[in-house]
Amino acid sequence: MFLVKKIAVRIRGIDTPELNDKREEIRNIAIKAKEELEKLFNSGNKIILYNLGRDKYFRLLASVKVGDIDVAEYMIKKGLAKSYDGGAKVW
């Protein structure tokens, strides 16, 4: 028997725009970011979480790889995320 529970994990080192942002151009980037992450996570490659910790709000935080792809670097290169160190929001 398997017990399955969804757990939200924030990707270490990046900030993506909010889907409910008032600015349409930012919302469009947020939608593209969500779609790109879904595509990446559903690719069938192994998902690896490492460097686990908690952010300042105690949310689960991890570095993430899908296959050989570092997800944070990938999203930044695609222009769908910005580098983030836990300080002020960057969008």
What are these regions (language model features)?
Residues 1-91:
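Small beta-barrel nucleic-acid-binding modules, primarily SNase/OB-fold domains
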